[in-house]
């Protein structure tokens, strides 16, 4: 007799809390009372776990509580809101999945909360009990209800693979779903030139017969026969240019399409769409900071993003040229990096309208000024103050792009909050495929900056920024991130995008469904380092030895100037090296302090940091000024002279590359101690140069580095442990010099496998093709979302932007 499996309902969080109350009543009351005793406020995960551990110390019988279902709840809780006698807990069983529960500690009652109810309760921390039951809520879930999406957390960030499976499955099940592909190929033109198909092919059946006829003709030709020699025959059959430059490539492309028409599969569909000629003109938005090629790195708001984009466009132009040639076309690609023109350019080229990017032929920086009713803004302003200028900037940029390209771009890429908002405005206006790259979403960098947004408003204007981020990420056709963590965090930490799923700005609006991290628009595409500048220290023939004298002066000079202070007395010691902007999040002063406090580390190694200004009078950045003052205080307090060298921000990338290698010659290490790092370009640079790397476990570096194999993870919130890890490494290297080589080689292997610009550019171009097709197929469904976002922009964002004081100058 066969038995059928018995299915049981997975208990909700509420059920598990209720069951725990029944089984461990006294222990749970003791724990919850401890939470309530801390008073009104927000408890972080470590607070919740610490109190659970504390009651274990009092009574070992409570071990069952910790190891049981309630212990699992506490370990997956991201925060708890305490408003005595209530404790509301936000539980995240796995990335992207949330539940909310509230316990009345006095009455021992438990209730499950909706997102809206939880956020309403949280708002009472700031607003008190509100009588207003009608609050503006942003909810994008209804617009996405019919959209396909994966359900497993492991699928997050692999959006294009899921989309290809969905599209090919639909085509396989329903041949009518092939019609949009035919229409897509038929409407393909560029500046009046028909591409792919002409009007002779009006149906799928005619397409199939034309492909078979073309296949028969092409198979008789030599594989390297140029397209021009058989162009006329193909045109008469219904085919235009774009299939390939030789008979072999055209035949391969046509075989791909025949396979799709006969039995679609995800891999074939992606390969085909990736090769269809779609992208000839690209616009990349990056308005804030000093965007230039020389003398800008280290200036306020100017760092890794500039390096990222300049490396990106070089790789992208190269990939576009290769693809256009292989497609049998003779079009000239154009890439425009659109940024702000700054008349008072501080000795940079940021006051020039057009500047060709070195190492490219067809890529330029196009600068457009910020302007208001008072005229053109001449001076730099903080990225936090740009909001009143962006709408007018977008209008001016549209005109400048049209003049420069003589057409609309095919693809727009936004960078950071301001660039992504401008990209959204342009893509919406032009009907162009839009890609979003956040680099860093500020909401995760400043804890509780949503619930207590009013405290941050005068300095940071986060109400504008968070609103702009929501609009841009939902308007984008696809989003690329450098790491999984940017999207959905880790088992225990929230991702940058995930933090925008549900949050509240009390008194402004409440987000009950801001973004879905399972959305197939998310893709992980990791950048690399420019390998003409960053290459292994062991590559002796390429080493820039002519720079060694200037590097020695930087590191070992005794002169105290505005460019460098401190000194290194013992040149035989390895060097710990760090290079970053001098702000709170980058935590350079934290590294200096942990080094200063560890006498064993000071005995083993020297410390060199390249960061910001040394003279506080030279900085106009609020955070940098505080960090400069702190650095000077640390030098005096711990008497670091002789073991520590502080060098101002260096803008010569070639010398910076050789600086990494010079540090490697000392058998030193690179340390990236940030409290949070979205990706970690300097980590990739250091590893590419063969320098053993220690980097924050909060953010991207945790994915780049395999702990103990290709580098080491450090926790900036536990600096003593981080410094001991460094002591252990250098002590082992002293005893076994091969240990240093092993870690160095492990880092290089990791880079070559995952983090190169060639891999990046190939992937980005393929994504542009697939999502352009998806945009064409799903245009009706996306239209509702965009109209909703447009209303939110006009009715909410505009007022917020207009409330930001207009910068003078």
Swiss-Prot record:
Residues 278-756 are annotated as: GT-B glycosyltransferase. Signal peptide: none annotated. Sucrose-cleaving enzyme that provides UDP-glucose and fructose for various metabolic pathways. Its EC number is 2.4.1.13. It catalyses: an NDP-alpha-D-glucose + D-fructose = a ribonucleoside 5'-diphosphate + sucrose + H(+). Transmembrane segments: none annotated. GO terms for molecular function: sucrose synthase activity. It comes from the Eukaryota. Keywords: Glycosyltransferase, Transferase. Belongs to the glycosyltransferase 1 family. Plant sucrose synthase subfamily. InterPro entries: Glyco_trans_1, Sucrose_synth_GT-B1, Sucrose_synthase_pln/cyn, SUS_EPBD, SUS_N. GO terms for biological process: sucrose metabolic process. The gene is SUS2. SUPFAM superfamilies: UDP-Glycosyltransferase/glycogen phosphorylase. This is Sucrose synthase 2.
């Amino acid at each position: 007799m066969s038995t059928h499996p018995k299915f049981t309902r997975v208990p909700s969080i509420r059920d598990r809390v209720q069951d725990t109350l029944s089984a461990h009543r006294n222990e749970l009351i003791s724990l919850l009372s401890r939470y309530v005793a801390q008073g009104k406020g927000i408890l972080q995960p470590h607070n919740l776990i610490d109190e659970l551990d504390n009651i274990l110390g009092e009574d070992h019988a409570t071990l069952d509580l910790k190891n049981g279902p309630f212990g699992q709840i506490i370990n997956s809780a991201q925060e708890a809101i305490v408003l005595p006698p209530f404790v509301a807990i936000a539980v995240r069983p796995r990335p992207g999945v949330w539940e909310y529960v509230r316990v009345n500690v006095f009455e021992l009652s438990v209730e499950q909360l909706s997102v809206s109810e939880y956020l309403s309760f949280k708002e009472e921390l700031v607003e008190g009990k509100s009588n207003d039951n009608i609050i503006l809520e942003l909810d994008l879930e209804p617009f996405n209800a019919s959209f396909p999406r994966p359900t497993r957390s492991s699928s997050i960030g692999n959006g294009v693979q899921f989309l290809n499976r969905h599209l090919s499955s639909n085509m396989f099940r329903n041949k009518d779903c092939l019609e949009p592909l035919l229409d897509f190929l038929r409407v393909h033109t560029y500046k009046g030139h028909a591409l792919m198909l002409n009007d002779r092919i009006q149906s799928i059946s005619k397409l199939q017969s034309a492909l078979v006829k073309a296949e028969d003709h092409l198979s008789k030709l030599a594989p390297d026969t140029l397209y021009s020699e058989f162009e006329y025959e193909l045109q008469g059959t219904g085919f235009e240019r774009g299939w390939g430059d030789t008979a072999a490539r055209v035949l391969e492309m046509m075989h791909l399409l025949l396979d799709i028409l006969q039995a679609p599969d995800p891999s074939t569909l992606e390969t085909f769409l990736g090769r269809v000629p779609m992208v000839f003109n690209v616009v990349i938005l990056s308005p804030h900071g000093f965007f230039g090629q020389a003398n800008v790195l280290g200036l306020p708001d100017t760092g890794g993003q500039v390096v990222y984009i300049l490396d990106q466009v070089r790789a992208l132009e190269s990939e576009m040229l290769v693809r256009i040639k292989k497609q049998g076309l003779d079009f000239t690609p154009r890439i425009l990096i659109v940024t702000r023109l700054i008349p008072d350019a501080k000795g940079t080229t940021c006051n020039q309208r057009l500047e060709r990017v070195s190492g490219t032929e067809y890529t330029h920086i196009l600068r457009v000024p910020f302007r208001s009713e008072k005229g053109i803004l001449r001076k730099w302003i903080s990225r936090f103050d740009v909001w009143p200028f962006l709408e007018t900037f977008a209008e001016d940029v549209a005109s400048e792009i049209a003049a420069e390209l003589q057409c609309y771009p095919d693809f727009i890429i936004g960078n950071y909050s301001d660039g992504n908002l401008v990209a959204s405005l342009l893509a919406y206006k032009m009907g162009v495929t839009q890609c979003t790259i956040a680099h860093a979403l500020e909401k995760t960098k400043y804890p509780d900056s949503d619930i207590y947004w009013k405290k941050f408003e005068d300095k940071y204007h986060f109400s504008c920024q968070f609103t702009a981020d929501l609009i841009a990420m939902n308007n984008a056709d696809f989003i690329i991130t450098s790491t999984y963590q940017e999207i959905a965090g880790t088992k225990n930490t929230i991702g940058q995008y995930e933090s925008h799923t549900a949050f509240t700005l009390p008194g402004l609006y409440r987000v009950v469904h801001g973004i879905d991290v399972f959305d197939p628009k998310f893709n992980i595409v990791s950048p690399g380092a420019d390998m003409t500048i960053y290459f292994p220290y062991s590559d002796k023939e390429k080493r820039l030895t002519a720079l060694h004298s200037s590097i020695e002066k930087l590191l070992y000079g005794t002169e105290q100037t505005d460019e460098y202070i401190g000194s290194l007395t013992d040149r035989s010691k390895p060097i710990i090296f760090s290079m970053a902007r001098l702000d709170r999040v980058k935590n350079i002063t934290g590294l200096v302090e942990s080094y200063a406090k560890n006498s064993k580390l000071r005995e083993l190694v020297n410390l060199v940091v390249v960061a910001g200004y040394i003279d506080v009078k030279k900085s106009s950045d609020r955070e940098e000024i505080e960090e400069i003052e702190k650095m000077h205080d640390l030098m005096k307090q711990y008497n670091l002279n002789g073991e520590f060298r502080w060098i101002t921000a260096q803008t010569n990338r070639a010398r910076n590359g050789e600086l990494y290698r010079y540090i490697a010659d000392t058998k030193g290490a690179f340390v990236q101690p940030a409290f949070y790092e979205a990706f970690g370009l300097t980590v990739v640079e250091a590893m590419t140069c063969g320098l053993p790397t220690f980097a924050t476990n909060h953010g991207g570096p945790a994915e780049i580095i395999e702990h103990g194999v290709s580098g080491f993870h450090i926790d900036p919130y536990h600096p003593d442990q981080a410094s001991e890890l460094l002591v252990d490494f250098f002590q082992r290297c002293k005893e076994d010099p091969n240990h240093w080589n092993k870690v160095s080689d492990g880092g290089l292997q990791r880079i070559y496998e995952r983090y190169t610009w060639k891999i990046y550019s190939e992937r980005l171009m393929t994504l542009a093709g697939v999502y352009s097709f998806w945009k064409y197929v799903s245009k009706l469904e996306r239209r509702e979302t965009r109209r909703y976002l447009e209303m939110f922009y006009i009715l909410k964002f505009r007022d917020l932007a207009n409330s930001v004081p207009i910068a003078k100058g």
